[in-house]
C-alpha cells in the first residue's frame, strides 16, 4: 500500500517526505490501526507540494460537462483532485502496478460562521468527482470544517468533549477570535507543525478519540471505505 498526499503546507500535510505534517501523522495513525503497520515508518508515502499540484492543475483542460456549471470555489477543489490523480498515475510508474494507492487531498473548508453544511458537502463531492474523472477510485477528501485547528482544539482544549460546535466557528482568520488565535491562546505559542507533531507523538492528539466532528467523521468513513475495498 502506498499513500500519496497533498495539502496546504507545513502545518497540515507537510511540504516534503522528510518533513511530514500533523495531518499526515493522523492519517497514518488511522491507517496503521487498521492494517497493522505505519506507512510512514515503511516509507510508503509521498507528499506532493501545493505549488506542484497548482502548476499541474493549470495544465488541465476542462472536460465537456453539459448542463453542469461549477462555482469557482468548488472548481478549485475539483481541479486539484484531478491534478493529484494525474500525478499519482505518474508515480504509479515508479512504484509498480501491483501496489495499491491511496490518495488524500487536504484542504481547509475555510467557511464563514454563516456557511451551511451544503457548501462543505459540495467541496467534498467536487474532490471525489475530480478523482473519479481521472480513474482514481481510492481517493479521499480531507476537508476540516472550517479548518484543521478545530480538530486540534477538540483534542487539546476540549478534551474530546462537545466538539461539534467548533465546526460552527468561522474559518476566516480575520474574524473575531479566529480558531487559529484560539489555538495559539491555548498553547501559549504558535501551533506550528513541529509542535503539533510532538503532541501527536506524545498521545495528546488522538484521531480515534475525536468522535463528534462531522467533517472528521466523513474523512474517517471514506478512508475506511477505501481500505475495505483494497483488502478484498
Question: What feature does the model see in each segment?
Answer:
Residues 1, 100-101, 134-139:
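Short glycine-/polar-rich loops that comprise or flank the Walker A/P-loop
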Residues 1-78:
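Domain-level signal for Mg2+-assisted phosphodiester chemistry and nucleotide/NA-binding surfaces
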Residues 4-10, 99-112:
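Acidic beta-strand-to-loop metal/phosphate-binding motif
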Residues 26, 30, 123, 127, ...:
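Charge-rich, solvent-exposed alpha-helical interaction surfaces
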Residues 80-106:
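Ordered, amphipathic secondary-structure segments that act as subunit-interaction surfaces
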Residues 107-193:
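Activity-critical C-terminal alpha-helical subdomain
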Residues 193-232:
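Charged phosphate-binding loop/patch that engages nucleotide di/tri-phosphates or the phosphate backbone
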Amino acid at each position: 500500500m502506498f499513500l500519496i498526499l497533498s495539502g496546504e503546507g507545513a502545518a497540515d500535510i507537510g511540504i516534503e517526505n522528510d518533513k511530514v505534517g500533523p495531518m499526515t501523522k493522523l492519517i497514518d495513525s488511522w491507517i496503521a490501526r487498521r492494517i497493522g503497520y505505519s506507512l510512514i515508518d515503511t516509507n510508503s508515502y509521498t507528499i506532493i507540494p501545493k505549488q506542484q499540484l497548482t502548476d499541474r492543475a493549470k495544465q488541465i483542460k476542462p472536460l465537456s460537462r453539459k448542463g453542469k456549471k461549477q462555482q469557482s470555489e468548488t472548481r478549485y477543489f475539483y481541479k486539484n483532485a484531478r491534478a493529484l490523480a494525474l500525478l499519482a498515475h505518474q508515480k504509479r510508474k515508479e512504484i509498480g502496478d501491483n501496489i495499491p494507492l491511496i490518495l488524500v487531498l487536504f484542504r481547509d473548508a475555510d467557511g464563514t460562521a454563516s456557511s451551511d453544511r451544503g457548501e462543505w458537502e459540495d467541496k467534498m463531492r467536487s474532490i471525489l468527482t475530480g478523482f473519479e474523472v481521472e480513474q482514481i477510485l481510492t481517493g479521499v477528501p480531507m476537508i476540516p470544517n472550517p479548518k484543521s485547528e478545530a480538530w486540534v482544539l477538540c483534542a487539546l482544549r476540549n478534551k474530546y468533549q462537545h466538539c461539534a460546535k467548533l465546526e460552527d466557528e468561522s474559518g476566516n482568520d480575520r474574524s473575531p477570535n479566529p480558531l487559529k488565535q484560539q489555538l495559539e491562546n491555548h498553547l501559549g505559542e504558535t501551533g506550528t507543525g513541529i509542535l503539533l507533531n510532538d503532541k501527536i507523538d506524545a498521545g495528546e492528539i488522538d484521531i480515534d478519540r475525536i468522535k463528534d466532528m462531522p467533517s472528521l467523521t466523513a474523512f474517517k468513513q471514506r478512508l475506511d471505505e477505501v481500505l475495505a475495498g483494497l483488502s478484498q
